[in-house]
């Protein structure tokens, strides 16, 4: 009985090992996971086109309210009010002009 189970185990082992040897992917299938250097450089150059002079990120637009915001930050009353109701409403209440 032991020899029969040992032979069966050896046969299963040989069968499994032969399947693993034949299970390697062919060259055409494994090449699909990678791209050529030319295709890769096209992708990188396409992405660089959207960056600002190679600095890493597009340049932000200047905020037109920044000078008013700095004036409001220098006034403690306006700064405190801006924390509660927002910058534009606080600036309008303190200085009386619309932003």
From Swiss-Prot:
Binding site for Ca(2+) 2: 70, 73
Annotated Ca(2+) 1 binding sites: 66
InterPro entries: GLA-like_dom_SF, GLA_domain, Osteocalcin, Osteocalcin/MGP
Signal peptide residue numbers: 1-23
One annotated GO molecular function: hormone activity
A single BP term in Gene Ontology: type B pancreatic cell proliferation
Location of Hydroxyproline modifications: 58
Subcellular location: Secreted
Keywords: Biomineralization, Calcium, Cleavage on pair of basic residues, Disulfide bond, Gamma-carboxyglutamic acid, Hormone, Hydroxylation, Metal-binding, Secreted, Signal
Residues bearing PTM 4-carboxyglutamate: 66, 70, 73
Residue ranges occupied by any Gla domain in the UniProt entry: 50-96
Sequence positions that bind Ca(2+) 3: 73, 79
Post-translational events: Gamma-carboxyglutamate residues are formed by vitamin K dependent carboxylation by GGCX. These residues are essential for the binding of calcium. Decarboxylation promotes the hormone activity.
UniProt entry tagged with the keyword Disulfide bond: yes
Positions of disulphide bridges: 72-78
Proregion span(s): 24-49
UniProt GO cellular component terms: cell projection; cytoplasm; dendrite; extracellular region; extracellular space; perikaryon; vesicle
Coiled-coil region list: none
PANTHER family from the UniProt entry: OSTEOCALCIN (PTHR14235:SF0)
Similarity annotation: Belongs to the osteocalcin/matrix Gla protein family.
Function: The carboxylated form is one of the main organic components of the bone matrix, which constitutes 1-2% of the total bone protein: it acts as a negative regulator of bone formation and is required to limit bone formation without impairing bone resorption or mineralization. The carboxylated form binds strongly to apatite and calcium. The uncarboxylated form acts as a hormone secreted by osteoblasts, which regulates different cellular processes, such as energy metabolism, male fertility and brain development. Regulates of energy metabolism by acting as a hormone favoring pancreatic beta-cell proliferation, insulin secretion and sensitivity and energy expenditure.
Protein name, as recorded: Osteocalcin
Organism: Rattus norvegicus
Lineage: Eukaryota, Metazoa, Chordata, Craniata, Vertebrata
